[in-house]
Amino acid sequence: MELLDKLTILADAAKYDAACTSSGLDRAGRPSGLGSTLAAGCCHSFSADGRCISLLKVLLTNRCVYDCAYCVNRRSSDVRRAAFTPRELAELTIGFYRRNYIEGLFLSSAVWGGPDRTTEAMIEALRLLREEYGFRGYIHAKAIPGADPLLTRRLGLLADRLSVNIELPSEESLGRLAPDKAKAAILAPMAQIRDGIQASRGELARFRHAPRFAPAGQSTQMIIGATPESDRHILTLTQALYDKYKLKRVFYSAYMPVSNHRLLPAPQSFRPPLLREHRLYQADWLLRFYHFRAEELLDEAHPNFNPLVDPKCSWALNHPEFFPVEVNRADYEALLRVPGIGVTSARRILVARRCAPLTFAGLKKLGVVLKRAQYFLTCGGKYLEGLRVSPDGVLRHLVAQERPMLAQGAPEQLSLFEQTG
Protein backbone atom coordinates (compact mmCIF):
# COMPACT_ATOMS: atom_id res chain seq x y z
CA MET A 1 0.00 0.00 0.00
CA GLU A 2 1.27 3.48 -0.87
CA LEU A 3 2.32 5.74 2.00
CA LEU A 4 -0.28 8.38 1.05
CA ASP A 5 -3.03 5.76 1.21
CA LYS A 6 -1.87 4.74 4.68
CA LEU A 7 -1.83 8.35 5.82
CA THR A 8 -5.33 8.94 4.45
CA ILE A 9 -6.72 5.91 6.29
CA LEU A 10 -4.88 6.37 9.59
CA ALA A 11 -5.33 10.14 9.88
CA ASP A 12 -9.06 9.72 9.27
CA ALA A 13 -9.21 6.90 11.83
CA ALA A 14 -7.68 9.21 14.47
CA LYS A 15 -10.04 12.15 13.99
CA TYR A 16 -12.37 11.21 16.87
CA ASP A 17 -9.59 11.50 19.43
CA ALA A 18 -9.81 14.90 21.09
CA ALA A 19 -6.99 14.64 23.60
CA CYS A 20 -4.31 16.39 21.59
CA THR A 21 -3.53 19.65 23.34
CA SER A 22 0.12 20.55 23.65
CA SER A 23 0.31 23.16 26.40
CA GLY A 24 2.56 23.15 29.42
CA LEU A 25 5.94 22.21 27.98
CA ASP A 26 9.27 23.97 27.56
CA ARG A 27 11.49 21.44 25.76
CA ALA A 28 14.18 23.70 24.27
CA GLY A 29 15.89 23.11 20.95
CA ARG A 30 19.53 22.08 20.55
CA PRO A 31 22.04 22.98 17.84
CA SER A 32 22.10 19.35 16.70
CA GLY A 33 18.36 18.79 17.02
CA LEU A 34 15.28 19.55 15.00
CA GLY A 35 12.28 21.38 16.42
CA SER A 36 11.46 23.04 19.71
CA THR A 37 8.41 23.53 21.86
CA LEU A 38 9.45 27.11 22.61
CA ALA A 39 9.79 29.52 19.70
CA ALA A 40 8.88 27.35 16.76
CA GLY A 41 7.25 24.39 18.41
CA CYS A 42 3.71 23.89 19.57
CA CYS A 43 1.69 26.80 18.31
CA HIS A 44 -1.96 26.03 19.01
CA SER A 45 -4.41 25.97 16.15
CA PHE A 46 -7.94 24.68 16.63
CA SER A 47 -10.66 23.69 14.23
CA ALA A 48 -14.23 24.96 14.64
CA ASP A 49 -15.18 22.09 16.97
CA GLY A 50 -12.27 22.81 19.31
CA ARG A 51 -9.89 20.08 18.23
CA CYS A 52 -6.21 20.87 17.95
CA ILE A 53 -4.90 20.80 14.37
CA SER A 54 -1.31 21.86 14.98
CA LEU A 55 -0.17 18.26 15.40
CA LEU A 56 0.02 15.36 13.00
CA LYS A 57 -2.75 13.29 14.60
CA VAL A 58 -2.48 9.74 13.36
CA LEU A 59 -2.76 6.09 14.36
CA LEU A 60 0.13 3.68 14.04
CA THR A 61 -2.44 1.12 12.90
CA ASN A 62 -6.23 0.78 12.83
CA ARG A 63 -6.10 -3.02 12.95
CA CYS A 64 -7.58 -3.99 16.29
CA VAL A 65 -8.16 -7.14 18.30
CA TYR A 66 -10.88 -5.43 20.37
CA ASP A 67 -14.52 -5.03 19.35
CA CYS A 68 -15.68 -1.92 21.23
CA ALA A 69 -19.17 -1.06 19.98
CA TYR A 70 -18.58 2.72 19.90
CA CYS A 71 -15.29 2.61 17.97
CA VAL A 72 -14.95 3.00 14.21
CA ASN A 73 -11.82 0.80 14.30
CA ARG A 74 -13.41 -2.13 16.14
CA ARG A 75 -12.60 -5.64 14.99
CA SER A 76 -15.97 -6.19 13.29
CA SER A 77 -16.03 -2.81 11.49
CA ASP A 78 -15.94 -2.95 7.69
CA VAL A 79 -13.26 -0.31 7.10
CA ARG A 80 -9.99 -0.23 5.18
CA ARG A 81 -7.08 -1.29 7.36
CA ALA A 82 -3.51 -0.05 7.31
CA ALA A 83 -0.40 0.14 9.46
CA PHE A 84 2.74 2.27 9.43
CA THR A 85 6.12 0.80 10.10
CA PRO A 86 7.99 2.79 12.76
CA ARG A 87 10.39 4.05 10.08
CA GLU A 88 7.56 5.22 7.82
CA LEU A 89 5.91 7.15 10.62
CA ALA A 90 9.16 8.79 11.72
CA GLU A 91 10.05 9.88 8.18
CA LEU A 92 6.53 11.16 7.55
CA THR A 93 6.56 13.25 10.74
CA ILE A 94 9.96 14.76 9.98
CA GLY A 95 8.92 15.52 6.42
CA PHE A 96 5.76 17.31 7.54
CA TYR A 97 7.64 19.24 10.20
CA ARG A 98 10.30 20.46 7.77
CA ARG A 99 7.56 21.71 5.46
CA ASN A 100 6.00 23.60 8.38
CA TYR A 101 2.75 21.62 8.12
CA ILE A 102 2.83 20.58 11.79
CA GLU A 103 4.38 21.51 15.11
CA GLY A 104 4.47 18.04 16.60
CA LEU A 105 3.02 14.54 16.66
CA PHE A 106 -0.01 13.02 18.36
CA LEU A 107 0.38 9.25 18.16
CA SER A 108 -2.23 6.70 19.10
CA SER A 109 -2.94 3.21 17.89
CA ALA A 110 -5.45 0.42 17.81
CA VAL A 111 -4.26 -2.72 19.60
CA TRP A 112 -2.87 -5.23 17.14
CA GLY A 113 -1.02 -8.31 18.35
CA GLY A 114 -1.50 -7.34 22.00
CA PRO A 115 -0.73 -4.25 24.11
CA ASP A 116 2.98 -5.05 24.43
CA ARG A 117 3.57 -5.50 20.71
CA THR A 118 1.69 -2.30 19.90
CA THR A 119 3.56 -0.29 22.53
CA GLU A 120 6.91 -1.63 21.31
CA ALA A 121 6.14 -0.41 17.78
CA MET A 122 5.17 3.04 19.11
CA ILE A 123 8.38 3.20 21.16
CA GLU A 124 10.49 2.37 18.11
CA ALA A 125 8.81 5.11 16.05
CA LEU A 126 9.46 7.69 18.77
CA ARG A 127 13.01 6.44 19.32
CA LEU A 128 13.77 7.00 15.64
CA LEU A 129 12.32 10.51 15.84
CA ARG A 130 14.21 11.50 18.98
CA GLU A 131 17.53 9.72 18.55
CA GLU A 132 18.08 9.24 14.82
CA TYR A 133 16.35 12.34 13.44
CA GLY A 134 17.06 14.57 16.45
CA PHE A 135 13.43 15.71 16.69
CA ARG A 136 12.92 18.01 19.69
CA GLY A 137 9.32 19.01 19.00
CA TYR A 138 6.23 18.03 20.93
CA ILE A 139 5.05 14.42 21.06
CA HIS A 140 1.83 13.23 22.69
CA ALA A 141 1.53 9.44 22.86
CA LYS A 142 -1.33 7.21 23.93
CA ALA A 143 -0.35 4.60 26.49
CA ILE A 144 -1.97 1.22 25.87
CA PRO A 145 -3.80 -0.31 28.88
CA GLY A 146 -2.48 -3.77 29.64
CA ALA A 147 1.04 -3.09 28.38
CA ASP A 148 4.05 -4.03 30.48
CA PRO A 149 4.85 -1.17 32.92
CA LEU A 150 8.45 -1.13 31.68
CA LEU A 151 7.20 -0.40 28.16
CA THR A 152 4.96 2.39 29.43
CA ARG A 153 8.00 3.79 31.22
CA ARG A 154 10.04 3.78 28.00
CA LEU A 155 7.19 5.44 26.13
CA GLY A 156 7.01 8.22 28.73
CA LEU A 157 10.73 8.92 28.44
CA LEU A 158 10.31 9.60 24.71
CA ALA A 159 7.00 11.49 24.76
CA ASP A 160 6.17 14.87 26.26
CA ARG A 161 2.65 13.93 27.29
CA LEU A 162 1.02 10.55 27.85
CA SER A 163 -2.67 9.81 27.98
CA VAL A 164 -4.80 6.79 28.77
CA ASN A 165 -8.39 6.95 27.55
CA ILE A 166 -10.90 6.14 30.26
CA GLU A 167 -13.31 5.59 27.33
CA LEU A 168 -16.73 5.70 29.07
CA PRO A 169 -18.00 7.38 32.26
CA SER A 170 -18.87 4.22 34.20
CA GLU A 171 -17.64 0.67 34.70
CA GLU A 172 -21.10 -0.63 33.80
CA SER A 173 -21.08 1.12 30.42
CA LEU A 174 -17.54 -0.07 29.75
CA GLY A 175 -18.58 -3.66 30.43
CA ARG A 176 -21.55 -3.40 28.06
CA LEU A 177 -19.89 -1.61 25.14
CA ALA A 178 -16.25 -2.66 25.52
CA PRO A 179 -16.27 -6.12 27.13
CA ASP A 180 -12.60 -6.68 26.24
CA LYS A 181 -11.54 -3.78 28.46
CA ALA A 182 -11.54 -3.44 32.24
CA LYS A 183 -11.57 -0.45 34.56
CA ALA A 184 -8.59 -1.73 36.56
CA ALA A 185 -6.49 -2.15 33.41
CA ILE A 186 -7.19 1.49 32.46
CA LEU A 187 -6.53 2.99 35.90
CA ALA A 188 -3.29 1.04 36.51
CA PRO A 189 -1.22 2.87 33.86
CA MET A 190 -2.75 6.19 34.95
CA ALA A 191 -1.42 5.57 38.46
CA GLN A 192 1.95 4.48 37.06
CA ILE A 193 2.23 7.63 34.94
CA ARG A 194 1.28 9.82 37.93
CA ASP A 195 3.96 8.20 40.08
CA GLY A 196 6.51 8.36 37.26
CA ILE A 197 5.92 12.08 36.74
CA GLN A 198 6.28 12.81 40.46
CA ALA A 199 9.47 10.74 40.69
CA SER A 200 10.91 12.44 37.60
CA ARG A 201 10.29 15.90 39.06
CA GLY A 202 12.07 14.87 42.25
CA GLU A 203 15.07 13.58 40.29
CA LEU A 204 15.22 16.76 38.19
CA ALA A 205 15.29 18.86 41.35
CA ARG A 206 18.46 17.05 42.39
CA PHE A 207 20.04 16.26 39.03
CA ARG A 208 19.63 18.81 36.27
CA HIS A 209 20.15 16.35 33.43
CA ALA A 210 18.04 13.50 34.78
CA PRO A 211 15.73 11.94 32.16
CA ARG A 212 12.30 13.57 32.00
CA PHE A 213 9.25 11.35 32.14
CA ALA A 214 6.14 12.79 30.44
CA PRO A 215 7.12 16.38 31.38
CA ALA A 216 3.84 17.83 30.05
CA GLY A 217 1.81 15.50 32.28
CA GLN A 218 -0.99 13.12 31.43
CA SER A 219 -4.56 13.46 30.22
CA THR A 220 -7.54 11.28 29.42
CA GLN A 221 -10.66 11.31 27.29
CA MET A 222 -14.18 10.00 27.72
CA ILE A 223 -17.07 9.63 25.29
CA ILE A 224 -20.30 11.37 26.24
CA GLY A 225 -23.76 10.76 24.83
CA ALA A 226 -23.32 7.09 23.96
CA THR A 227 -24.46 5.99 27.43
CA PRO A 228 -27.05 7.38 29.88
CA GLU A 229 -24.76 8.84 32.58
CA SER A 230 -25.72 12.32 33.78
CA ASP A 231 -23.52 15.41 33.69
CA ARG A 232 -23.25 15.12 37.47
CA HIS A 233 -21.84 11.60 37.18
CA ILE A 234 -19.36 12.70 34.51
CA LEU A 235 -18.21 15.78 36.42
CA THR A 236 -17.85 13.83 39.68
CA LEU A 237 -15.67 11.34 37.84
CA THR A 238 -13.64 14.19 36.38
CA GLN A 239 -13.10 15.69 39.84
CA ALA A 240 -11.92 12.32 41.15
CA LEU A 241 -9.48 11.91 38.24
CA TYR A 242 -7.97 15.33 38.87
CA ASP A 243 -7.68 14.68 42.59
CA LYS A 244 -6.33 11.13 42.49
CA TYR A 245 -4.29 10.95 39.29
CA LYS A 246 -3.15 14.60 38.98
CA LEU A 247 -4.25 14.85 35.37
CA LYS A 248 -3.53 17.97 33.32
CA ARG A 249 -6.72 17.66 31.31
CA VAL A 250 -9.84 15.58 30.93
CA PHE A 251 -11.23 15.71 27.40
CA TYR A 252 -14.84 15.09 26.46
CA SER A 253 -15.77 13.70 23.06
CA ALA A 254 -19.38 13.93 21.90
CA TYR A 255 -20.36 10.53 20.57
CA MET A 256 -20.46 10.38 16.79
CA PRO A 257 -22.66 7.58 15.39
CA VAL A 258 -20.36 5.03 13.78
CA SER A 259 -22.32 1.85 14.46
CA ASN A 260 -25.82 0.34 14.37
CA HIS A 261 -25.10 -1.59 17.56
CA ARG A 262 -28.29 -2.30 19.52
CA LEU A 263 -26.82 -0.77 22.70
CA LEU A 264 -26.00 2.55 21.04
CA PRO A 265 -28.27 5.43 19.93
CA ALA A 266 -29.76 4.88 16.47
CA PRO A 267 -27.67 6.86 13.93
CA GLN A 268 -30.75 7.93 11.99
CA SER A 269 -32.24 9.95 14.86
CA PHE A 270 -29.16 10.80 16.94
CA ARG A 271 -27.55 14.24 16.96
CA PRO A 272 -24.07 14.45 18.52
CA PRO A 273 -24.36 16.32 21.85
CA LEU A 274 -21.93 19.08 20.92
CA LEU A 275 -23.53 21.69 23.18
CA ARG A 276 -23.39 19.27 26.10
CA GLU A 277 -19.71 18.68 25.33
CA HIS A 278 -19.19 22.46 25.38
CA ARG A 279 -20.91 22.84 28.76
CA LEU A 280 -18.76 20.08 30.23
CA TYR A 281 -15.62 21.83 29.02
CA GLN A 282 -16.84 25.06 30.63
CA ALA A 283 -17.49 23.23 33.90
CA ASP A 284 -14.11 21.53 33.66
CA TRP A 285 -12.54 24.99 33.38
CA LEU A 286 -14.31 25.99 36.61
CA LEU A 287 -12.84 22.96 38.38
CA ARG A 288 -9.30 23.63 37.23
CA PHE A 289 -9.02 27.41 37.47
CA TYR A 290 -11.93 28.79 39.51
CA HIS A 291 -11.73 26.48 42.54
CA PHE A 292 -15.23 25.07 42.13
CA ARG A 293 -15.99 21.50 43.13
CA ALA A 294 -18.19 19.12 41.17
CA GLU A 295 -20.71 18.85 44.00
CA GLU A 296 -21.21 22.63 43.95
CA LEU A 297 -22.16 22.76 40.29
CA LEU A 298 -24.63 19.86 40.14
CA ASP A 299 -26.67 17.89 42.65
CA GLU A 300 -29.39 15.24 42.77
CA ALA A 301 -32.09 17.82 42.04
CA HIS A 302 -30.13 19.22 39.07
CA PRO A 303 -28.08 16.32 37.60
CA ASN A 304 -27.55 17.98 34.20
CA PHE A 305 -26.38 21.41 33.09
CA ASN A 306 -28.83 23.98 31.79
CA PRO A 307 -28.09 24.08 28.04
CA LEU A 308 -29.27 27.71 27.80
CA VAL A 309 -26.61 29.29 30.04
CA ASP A 310 -23.03 28.47 30.94
CA PRO A 311 -22.35 26.56 34.20
CA LYS A 312 -20.96 29.56 36.06
CA CYS A 313 -24.04 31.67 35.32
CA SER A 314 -26.24 28.73 36.23
CA TRP A 315 -24.50 28.38 39.60
CA ALA A 316 -24.88 32.11 40.24
CA LEU A 317 -28.60 32.03 39.45
CA ASN A 318 -29.07 29.07 41.81
CA HIS A 319 -27.22 30.81 44.68
CA PRO A 320 -28.72 34.30 45.04
CA GLU A 321 -27.61 34.39 48.69
CA PHE A 322 -24.00 34.80 47.52
CA PHE A 323 -24.74 37.99 45.57
CA PRO A 324 -24.31 40.85 45.04
CA VAL A 325 -20.54 40.86 45.54
CA GLU A 326 -19.06 44.23 46.48
CA VAL A 327 -16.12 44.55 44.12
CA ASN A 328 -14.17 46.93 46.37
CA ARG A 329 -14.16 44.57 49.36
CA ALA A 330 -14.53 41.00 48.07
CA ASP A 331 -11.60 38.61 48.30
CA TYR A 332 -10.11 36.77 45.33
CA GLU A 333 -12.20 33.62 45.81
CA ALA A 334 -15.45 35.61 45.89
CA LEU A 335 -14.51 37.54 42.75
CA LEU A 336 -13.87 34.29 40.88
CA ARG A 337 -17.48 33.26 41.52
CA VAL A 338 -18.89 36.29 39.68
CA PRO A 339 -19.95 35.57 36.07
CA GLY A 340 -17.95 37.79 33.73
CA ILE A 341 -14.89 37.93 36.00
CA GLY A 342 -12.03 35.65 35.04
CA VAL A 343 -8.75 34.75 36.70
CA THR A 344 -6.85 37.63 35.09
CA SER A 345 -9.50 40.28 35.69
CA ALA A 346 -9.90 39.17 39.33
CA ARG A 347 -6.18 39.70 39.91
CA ARG A 348 -6.32 43.07 38.19
CA ILE A 349 -9.17 44.12 40.47
CA LEU A 350 -7.15 43.28 43.59
CA VAL A 351 -4.27 45.43 42.34
CA ALA A 352 -6.32 48.34 41.00
CA ARG A 353 -8.49 48.88 44.07
CA ARG A 354 -5.42 49.54 46.21
CA CYS A 355 -5.09 52.88 44.45
CA ALA A 356 -8.72 54.04 44.29
CA PRO A 357 -12.28 52.74 44.62
CA LEU A 358 -13.40 50.92 41.48
CA THR A 359 -16.29 51.98 39.27
CA PHE A 360 -18.17 50.07 36.57
CA ALA A 361 -16.29 52.04 33.91
CA GLY A 362 -13.04 51.02 35.55
CA LEU A 363 -14.08 47.37 35.68
CA LYS A 364 -14.64 47.35 31.94
CA LYS A 365 -11.09 48.63 31.40
CA LEU A 366 -9.81 45.81 33.60
CA GLY A 367 -11.36 43.20 31.31
CA VAL A 368 -14.53 42.39 33.23
CA VAL A 369 -17.39 41.29 30.95
CA LEU A 370 -20.00 43.68 32.30
CA LYS A 371 -22.88 42.34 30.24
CA ARG A 372 -22.79 39.31 32.57
CA ALA A 373 -21.10 40.66 35.69
CA GLN A 374 -23.38 43.69 36.12
CA TYR A 375 -26.18 41.53 37.55
CA PHE A 376 -24.01 40.04 40.29
CA LEU A 377 -21.81 42.81 41.69
CA THR A 378 -21.92 46.31 43.13
CA CYS A 379 -19.46 49.19 43.20
CA GLY A 380 -19.62 51.24 46.39
CA GLY A 381 -22.75 49.36 47.41
CA LYS A 382 -24.69 50.26 44.25
CA TYR A 383 -25.69 48.37 41.11
CA LEU A 384 -24.98 49.83 37.69
CA GLU A 385 -27.13 52.93 37.24
CA GLY A 386 -30.49 52.15 35.64
CA LEU A 387 -30.11 48.38 36.01
CA ARG A 388 -33.16 46.44 37.19
CA VAL A 389 -32.31 43.08 38.74
CA SER A 390 -34.85 40.26 39.01
CA PRO A 391 -34.23 36.49 38.70
CA ASP A 392 -36.39 36.09 35.60
CA GLY A 393 -35.00 39.21 33.96
CA VAL A 394 -31.39 38.18 34.57
CA LEU A 395 -32.03 34.72 33.12
CA ARG A 396 -33.63 36.21 29.99
CA HIS A 397 -30.69 38.54 29.43
CA LEU A 398 -28.11 35.77 29.93
CA VAL A 399 -29.95 33.42 27.57
CA ALA A 400 -30.12 36.19 24.97
CA GLN A 401 -26.33 36.53 25.14
CA GLU A 402 -25.91 32.79 24.48
CA ARG A 403 -28.43 32.66 21.63
CA PRO A 404 -25.95 33.28 18.75
CA MET A 405 -23.89 30.28 19.86
CA LEU A 406 -26.95 28.10 20.40
CA ALA A 407 -28.10 28.82 16.84
CA GLN A 408 -24.84 27.70 15.23
CA GLY A 409 -24.90 24.57 13.11
CA ALA A 410 -22.83 21.53 13.91
CA PRO A 411 -19.13 22.09 13.21
CA GLU A 412 -17.19 19.81 10.90
CA GLN A 413 -13.80 18.18 11.36
CA LEU A 414 -11.20 19.72 9.05
CA SER A 415 -9.51 17.41 6.55
CA LEU A 416 -5.83 17.21 5.68
CA PHE A 417 -6.63 16.16 2.15
CA GLU A 418 -9.63 18.08 0.84
CA GLN A 419 -9.00 21.17 -1.27
CA THR A 420 -10.15 24.42 0.35
CA GLY A 421 -10.78 27.87 -1.05
Show which residues each predicted segment covers.
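Flexible, acidic/Gly-rich N-terminal and inter-domain linker regions that tether
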Residues: M1-R63, V369, L377-T378, K382-Q408, ...
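Conserved, mostly hydrophobic/aromatic
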Residues: L55, C68, L107, V164, ...
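Canonical Radical SAM [4Fe-4S] cluster-binding loop centered on the CxxxCxxC motif
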Residues: V58-R87
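Short, flexible active-site-proximal loops enriched in glycine and acidic residues
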Residues: V65-D67, A83, F96-F106
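Conserved AdoMet/S-adenosylmethionine-binding subsite of the radical SAM
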Residues: A90, G95, G113-L297
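Long, highly charged, low-complexity intrinsically disordered interaction regions
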Residues: L263-L336, R372-G421
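Residue-level signature of tetratricopeptide-repeat
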Residues: A352-R353
